[in-house]
Amino acid sequence: MGADRRRHAEHVMGTVVSFDVPARAGDPRGDGPLGRAVRWLHWVDATFSPYRDDSDVSRFGRGEVPLEQCVPELAEVLEACAAVSTRSGGYFTTTPGGRFDPSGYVKGWAVERAAGILTAAGPAGHSVNGGGDVQCSGDRMWRIGIADPLHPGRLALVVTGRDFAVATSGVAERREHIIDPYTGQPPAGLASITVVGARLAETDAYATAAFAMGTAARDWVEGLDGYEAFAITGSGTTWQTSGFDRYLD
């Protein structure tokens, strides 16, 4: 890492969010773009965590406050979640196991917005990685390793690209919010699925929905404009959508 770059890892939202940014983005505890992005993530954690009794998500989920008395970003998230649920035929849900929890959308949305704070301030060529789900910005060519869920410590492949988002759902991640809504059980068929798109909020949510679909995911992702996918099945076989090759070396 040269003097013109800065890397920072922030423990927040139950995961580690890693930044790779130009040095001019500033200090993570300062008032510059990096500091503002870090503070945004902690605000999201305090506001949207279903594990904090005093968060807006928890209070709304318990019926203690109406949506109108919550932060406006909650309505924004719920509208986006409803759209993904419709597009996925109900495989994406904010009530896994019957409990209100929009985490399947919030993390990708929060990381994408953090990257947007950096972009708006001018430092081009950065990545924000939230527990393996990544928003990359600028003209720099990025290489993102995809873990092999059946062989811990190994990579299944490396995807490359510019100004794109990569999200993976699977058995290797902490994915307790992924439930097949039609069976009420954890989904079967896939060990992991990686989705590549332009914006992490939707890319991450689509990866969640696709993992819940299991074997039906391939045809579904093929029908999404601007998205590609690579999957590893429970037996170790792999498949990819028709345009995924563009992201491989």
Language-model regions: role of each:
Residues M1-D249:
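Mature catalytic core of soluble alpha/beta enzymes
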